[in-house]
UniProtKB/Swiss-Prot annotation:
Belongs to the universal ribosomal protein uL23 family. It is found in: Plastid, Chloroplast. Part of the 50S ribosomal subunit. It comes from Acorus calamus (Sweet flag). This is Large ribosomal subunit protein uL23cz/uL23cy. One of its GO terms (biological process) is translation.
Length: 93
């Protein structure tokens, strides 16, 4: 499953790392239970809670045609104490 797009590194997400909370963008069609099951299976950790919100798409325009970028969902995953996951870094070329 490739539901997790990439990890998010903002001031808030870096601050939340101290509380054992990890932030990442996921596909908008993914559900909380799918992401929770995938994180627990892939990383071998226990998830306590998950918070999510949808990010607004940005407006784009090409000539007379107006559109918007794809919407993403941002998940904040809280792990049990003692567990951690490595940062999800997308390799960009």
């Amino acid at each position: 499953m490739d539901g997790i797009k990439y990890a998010v590194f903002t001031e808030k997400s870096i601050r939340l790392l101290g509380n054992n909370q990890y932030t990442s963008n996921v596909e908008s069609g993914s559900t909380r239970t799918e992401i929770k099951h995938w994180v627990e299976l892939f990383f071998g950790v226990k998830v306590i809670a998950m918070n999510s919100h949808r990010l607004p798409g940005k407006g784009r325009r090409v000539g007379p045609i107006k559109g918007h970028t794809m919407h993403y969902r941002r998940m904040i995953i809280t792990l049990q104490p003692g567990y951690s996951i490595p940062p999800l870094i997308e390799k960009r070329t």
